[in-house]
Amino acid sequence: MAKGQFPVEKLQQIETPFYYYDAELLRETLRSINAEAQKHEGFVVHFAVKANANPRVLRIIREAGLGADCVSGGEIEASVKAGFPSTKIVYAGVGKADWEINLGLDNDIFCFNVESIPELEVINELAAARGKTARVAFRLNPNVGAHTHANITTGLAENKFGIAMRDMLSVIGEAEKLSNVKFVGLHFHIGSQILDMGDFEALCNRVNELQDELDRHRIRVEHINVGGGLGVDYAHPNRVPIPDFKAYFDTYARHLRLRPGQTLHFELGRAVVAQCGSLITRTLYIKKGSVKQFCIVDAGFTDLIRPALYQAYHKIENITSDEPTEAYDVVGPICESTDVFAKQIDLNRCHRGDLLAIRSAGAYGEIMASQYNCRQLPHGYMSDEI
């Protein structure tokens, strides 16, 4: 959404800070995902609910036909409430509590992505108590390093996620000994905010090697889940509002060798929702320091933690001013020195009351908000509802 396309008069009437979602851009993004994925037989797309669990956002995504990728019992509950069919819900996570596993069993979800033998044994025990058989896939750690921030790299041997590749056959053997789990797939996830298709190609090569090994042992799996990880252009949200899903899906179609009848599952989060969301915040004060000036706004890292947590860049725009630009540090009210959205960025001259839009905030924004300093959680509003 370009700067001039924000409904400023309507936004001025809403108490800040809040999240504003462009419903049409979200739908356009989903249409692009479906158009490109459907070119390839057996491609199945799930939305990574951890990126955004706003109820209206989830409903729009469910209406587009995507499944849900969940990493907690709460996300399973949110997905069920939003109307996702249980047959399209997958549940991953390195530390699944008993009640969360039981929730998945009670809802007959598509698959548990299992990360250890002890977890597998607990799932088997809980499934037996309910007289059910749980479908499980094993999350393998492919030791593929993604070119992204260290805090969102998940596919290296040093990370807490997944089972070592060398243990693949032994964990499959353990599953075959248990009567209330059914081994159906392999799961991978190498990281997030990946823009280099070479990283996904490297994952494909590793998956091909593992499948070849399974073939040698006459082991067949129903599906391969390669996770998500596709990034977005935070620097140019207006120029590149929709990621290159064609290049993404084509990479897997060219380089990953599926067996006959296998399905290939994806778990896209950021790429689906990041660009449709903006954090709208109001300017409280312009403070002139000895060497710089500060634009102090009413949003803080309690509302959008990515800049403080990951040193992440978000484009910021003054959507109520067309005056000449000046350099500002944009900072929030939280009692921490890390409560900074940007340093020395050029904005149209800011005044008290001006609205700023912190762009590309639809993923890992509202969902990661906290009440530190006893602050209220921000609300979310859809463009077609205000």
Task: Describe the predicted segments one by one.
Residues M1-A134, K177-K182, D212, R216-I219, ...:
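A charged N-terminal "starter" segment
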Residues L25, N52, E75, K96, ...:
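Short, glycine-/Ser/Thr-/acidic-enriched flexible segments
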Residues K39-E41, A128-G131, R216-H217, P237-V240, ...:
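Short, glycine- and charge-enriched coil/turn segments that flank and shape catalytic ligand pockets
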Residues H46, R135, H223, T263, ...:
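Hydrophobic "anchor" residues on beta-strands that sit immediately upstream
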Residues A48, R135-N141, H187-H189, N225-G227, ...:
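Short beta-strand segments
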Residues N143-Y285, L347, N373:
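Active-site loop/helix belt of alpha/beta enzymes
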